[in-house]
Curated annotation (Swiss-Prot):
SUPFAM superfamilies: Metallo-hydrolase/oxidoreductase (SSF56281)
Keyword Secreted: no
Family matches, as Pfam families: Lactamase_B_2
Keyword Transport assigned: yes
InterPro entries in the cross-refs: Metallo-B-lactamas (IPR001279), PQQ_synth_PqqB (IPR011842), RibonucZ/Hydroxyglut_hydro (IPR036866)
Example GO biological process: pyrroloquinoline quinone biosynthetic process
Keywords: PQQ biosynthesis, Transport
First and last residue of the signal peptide: none
Name of the protein: Coenzyme PQQ synthesis protein B
């Protein structure tokens, strides 16, 4: 299984276009040693030719341009994208579909709840109908694994996660299973397993057991501290309120990952305020000490 990190930042990317927090300002003036990052999206393949896009970020055009296999050049109009999985209906993970309209129809896998949000509050399925058939919906059942014809050697298992529906959702304050999912992706030939959850608000005992059965954990790295937005002076909401488990503090992501010594551990969906973006920060050094990696655009993983 081939996993390509197309984008590794949270919403807004890094540096965020309108932000002058210490990270964004430091990156621009050269005082901060860090890498620019686009908004979170990955691609998965069983052969390196046909790819399943997991979430369609607003930065999708630049991401595809930066990864040569996404334009195999086999025909006058072509793409390496064979299917799309949407793990939630957040703007940061779905608006890239608008930039992919020239390639419609696209086969899209998502849950009932995500499909409802994207047919009502943010009606992408309706909007794109006029583009050569638009988006063909394939339902993700929460209690069953599924395969995708273009990558038959991969088995996808959805994991309902506790998180918040987007503000435009009809059930914004009434969470439902399927608002947000993680994925277990298993290569049926090698047995390699990827656990992917860029939006992870809570890890309970059953989920921890599932993570322990995976080879690589690609997990929510949004914030270092739960009150990071307040500390940086750029917001009032906590990470938990937004459905993200912070790395630091009792019961935080680092405590969770400490219980999984055998797995490869990679943080993704990193907010522009997170001090781990600073490669010289104490927080980044703590990750190195704990053998936890920070995803970057262009990172490749093979399982």
């Amino acid at each position: 299984m081939f996993v390509q990190i197309l984008g590794s930042a949270a919403g807004g990317g890094f540096p965020q276009w309108n932000c002058n927090c210490v990270n964004c300002a430091g990156f621009r003036d050269g005082s901060l040693r860090a890498q620019a990052r686009t908004q979170s999206s990955i691609a998965i393949s069983d052969d390196g030719v046909n790819w399943v896009l997991c979430n369609a970020s607003p930065d999708i055009r630049a991401q595809l341009q930066g990864f040569a296999p996404m334009q195999p050049g086999r025909a006058l109009r072509d793409t390496g994208i064979s299917a799309i999985i949407l793990m939630d209906s957040q703007i940061d993970h779905t608006t890239g579909l608008l930039s992919l309209r020239e390639g419609c129809p696209h086969q899209v896998w998502c849950t009932d709840m995500v499909h409802e949000d994207l047919s009502t509050g943010f009606p992408l399925f309706t909007m794109l109908t006029h583009w050569n058939g638009g988006l063909a919906w394939n339902r993700i059942e929460l209690d069953a694994s599924f395969t995708i014809p273009a990558c038959p050697n991969l088995r996808f298992t959805p994991l309902p996660l506790r998180s918040a529906a987007p503000p435009y959702s009809p059930h914004r304050f009434d969470p439902h299973p399927g608002d947000n999912i993680g994925l277990i992706v298993e290569d049926l030939r090698t047995g390699g397993k990827l656990f992917y959850a860029p939006g992870l608000g809570k890890v309970d005992a059953p989920l921890l057991e599932i993570m322990a059965g995976s080879d690589c954990l690609l997990v929510d790295g949004t914030m270092w501290d739960d009150d990071e937005m307040q500390r940086r002076g750029v917001g009032t909401r906590t990470g938990r309120e937004m459905g993200h488990l912070a790395q630091n503090g009792p019961g935080g992501m680092l405590d969770v990952l400490e219980q999984l010594p055998e797995q490869r551990k990679v943080l993704i969906h990193i907010n522009n305020t997170n001090p781990i973006l600073d490669e010289d920060s104490p927080e980044r050094a703590e990750l190195v000490r704990r053998n936890v990696e920070v995803a970057y655009d262009g990172m490749s993983i093979e399982l």
